[in-house]
């Protein structure tokens, strides 16, 4: 984060690269960079210093466009929770049925009608500071807010979709996985792909554990694969910026 200058007013990506070329690679270097240290800029740098000291990911996310939030994945890598949800139906009236959370390489899930509520989501997220999704802004986060209305105030959100798009990678999660050579169980993919809602309905109708097991196994791969995807996208973005630099 400390090499990021686009969080300050009046500094865009091109100006940021100029600063890097001139040896300005930390906020502390700004006074010697030749840039005008206006009262506003001094105030913003002080705010950023305080936010960094407090590891305030929400502050930094608020200062970055969604496609630039890959920068958070360096200093906050160990404070990320990777989240994916399965729905109980289709359309705007559907609700989360399974919420999968992967933290510290450990997967867990919450089920509608059993333990899926605000308090349990917060407990599972623990001391996480960042929630990482794929297409989360339009899907996961929007539906999670029905259960956890202030989730966007408590955690920063990193949506990998706009980051992938900026790299020229288009499509859904499975397509991005293939592009990045991230593998998942072929049996699970063939068994579940496009049938998650059907599996949920079969589970609630019959109570047969096999349906739930397959659904949560599918969700675990969706959820846990977000970590290697995020790291690859992060490093690709950094390499692209360094080449420009």
Where are these regions (language model features)?
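Two-metal-ion RNase H-like nuclease active-site motif
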Residues: 78-88, 219
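Short, flexible loop/turn motifs enriched in small residues
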Residues: 91-97
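Catalytic micro-motifs at enzyme active sites that drive phosphoryl/nucleotidyl and oxygen chemistry
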Residues: 68-72, 86-90, 119-121
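Acidic, Mg2+-coordinating catalytic module of metal-dependent nucleases/exonucleases
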Residues: 181-245
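N-terminal accessory regions of nucleic-acid-interacting proteins
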Residues: 1-77
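Acidic active-site catalytic centers that drive phospho-/nucleotidyl reactions
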Residues: 84-86, 140, 159, 222
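Conserved DEDDh/DEDDy metal-dependent 3′-5′ exonuclease domain
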Residues: 98-193
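Short catalytic/ligand-binding loop motif for oxyanion handling, primarily in non-cytosolic enzymes
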Residues: 90-91, 140-143, 227
């Amino acid at each position: 984060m400390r090499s990021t200058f686009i969080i300050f007013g009046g500094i865009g990506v091109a100006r940021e690269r100029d600063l890097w070329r001139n040896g300005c690679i930390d906020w502390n270097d700004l006074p010697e960079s030749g840039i005008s240290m206006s009262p506003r800029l001094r105030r913003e740098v002080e705010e950023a210093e305080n936010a960094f000291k407090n590891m305030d990911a929400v502050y930094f996310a608020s200062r970055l466009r969604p496609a630039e939030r890959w920068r958070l994945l360096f200093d906050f890598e160990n404070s990320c929770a990777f989240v994916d949800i399965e729905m109980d139906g289709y359309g705007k009236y559907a609700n989360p049925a399974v919420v999968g959370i992967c933290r510290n390489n450990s997967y867990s899930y919450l089920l509608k009608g059993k333990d899926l509520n605000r308090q349990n989501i917060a407990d599972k997220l623990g001391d996480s500071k960042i929630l990482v999704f794929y297409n989360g802004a339009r899907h996961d986060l929007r539906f999670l807010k029905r259960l956890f209305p202030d989730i966007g105030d408590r955690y920063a959100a990193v949506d990998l979709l706009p980051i992938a798009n900026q790299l020229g990678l288009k499509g859904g999660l499975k397509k991005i996985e293939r592009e990045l050579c991230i593998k998942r169980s072929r049996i699970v993919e063939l068994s579940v792909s496009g049938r998650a809602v059907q599996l949920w309905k079969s589970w609630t109708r019959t109570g047969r554990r096999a349906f739930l097991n397959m659904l949560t196994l599918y969700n675990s791969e969706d959820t846990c694969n977000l970590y290697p995807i995020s790291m690859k996208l992060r490093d690709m973005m950094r390499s692209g910026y360094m080449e420009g630099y």
